[in-house]
Amino acid sequence: FEIMKTHTLIGASVLENLEFADIVRGSDEDFQNLYGKSDAQEVYKEHIQFYCDRFLTTHGANGVNLHTRNFTRHFDSPQIQPLSTIGAGDNFNAGIIYGLLKYDVRHADLPSLDQDTWGKIIRCGMDLASEVCQSYDNYISKEFAAKYVSQS
């Protein structure tokens, strides 16, 4: 009974967060644990779309999927030799936020954001996540950050 109670409480918290979300992002493992499903399209249609139009799923070396009301697109991960994946998700999220700011995407722009702009934003997330996976640190270095920002 205690497990069911905990699962119910977690489910209620997830729904509350979905109601406030403008972008939902998680890994395939996250959604397997939450919903018992790893198919991103199925998770989007059955659990996310009603609450939020923009859904990003990360799949490690198998890339990133973006689902919106208007389109679905897959982005391949860069080929790297990972040392550790600790921090990859947090750095991906940081890269997404950086990309939104870099490309001057505002809240009002999200519903009509085109595939090319999404691609640039997601590339920022993948760049930061890929960088952190190539070290034993769970964050990007100051040197990488400075170089990355100067390339913009």
Model region roles, listed by residue range:
Residues 37-152:
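Conserved phosphate-binding/catalytic region of the ribokinase-like
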Residues 1-45:
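Conserved beta-alpha-beta core of the PfkB/ribokinase-like small-molecule kinase fold
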